[in-house]
Design a protein with these regions (language model features):
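Conserved Nudix-box catalytic region and its N-terminal flanking loop in Nudix hydrolases
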Residues: 46-88
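Acidic, metal-coordinating catalytic segment for phosphate/diphosphate chemistry
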Residues: 1-42
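Nucleotide phosphate-binding site architecture
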Residues: 5, 12, 27, 52, ...
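Short, highly charged C-terminal tails/helix-capping segments
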Residues: 171-177
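Unchanged
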Residues: 72-157, 161, 166-167, 179-181
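Short connector loops at helix/strand junctions that flank enzyme active sites
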Residues: 21, 36-40, 46, 60-62, ...
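Active-site donor-binding loop signature of nucleotide-sugar glycosyltransferases
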Residues: 28, 56, 69, 117, ...
Length: 181
């Protein structure tokens, strides 16, 4: 950040009075610019024990597999955002959303909130964001081509809970980027 969104003056990275973290502060008007984590919302859509996954058609990680998820928009509820992202990435409608997993991705300042849900019908198709969309069994999950660590964790938690026959709300965290193999 270089300039104040209130007055247009240059900002300085400094610790404001009565604070403990460096923030962008405008010396001209005194505005403190807080930068907070971004919320990513998504779904684990299921139809007859199969999970709907999509192959990314956009960067980052084009060509890798993921669950439908994306950034929450202003003025949108968390569940509505998860539904919208699922529709945008798969062309499908989901029902019976239940909050399932929250993952803090500390190093990139993101928080993921994933819902368990059902497909309203087995209707889905590729979209601008997904080059391929398909239902997969546990054995068909492309583990060697998962786009993001958070998606891998989500799938592992989900499959573990499904196998145990019991779901509860979970939390997890990712502190650092994956290391190259």
């Amino acid at each position: 950040m270089n300039y104040c969104s209130q007055c247009g003056g240059p900002v300085a990275l400094t610790v404001p009075p009565d604070d403990e973290r460096p923030r962008y502060v405008c010396p001209a008007c005194g505005t403190v610019h807080y930068q907070n984590p971004k919320l990513v919302v998504g779904c684990i859509p299921v139809w007859e024990e199969r999970i709907l996954m999509c192959r990314r058609a956009i960067e980052p990680r084009r060509g890798y597999w993921t669950l439908p998820a994306g950034f929450l928009e202003n003025g949108e509820t968390v569940a509505a955002g998860a539904r919208r992202e699922t529709f945008e990435e798969t062309g499908s409608r989901v029902v019976d959303l239940v909050p399932y997993l929250m993952v803090d991705i500390v190093y990139i300042h993101q928080i993921y909130l994933m819902y368990r849900c059902r497909l309203q019908a087995p209707d889905f198709h590729p979209t601008r964001e997904s080059s391929e969309v398909k239902l997969v069994t546990e054995a068909e999950i492309p583990w060697d081509a998962i786009a993001f660590t958070v998606i891998e964790k989500t799938l592992h938690h989900y499959l573990q809970d499904r196998s145990a026959g019991s779901f509860s709300f979970r939390t997890d965290r990712i502190d650092a980027p994956p290391t190259a193999a």
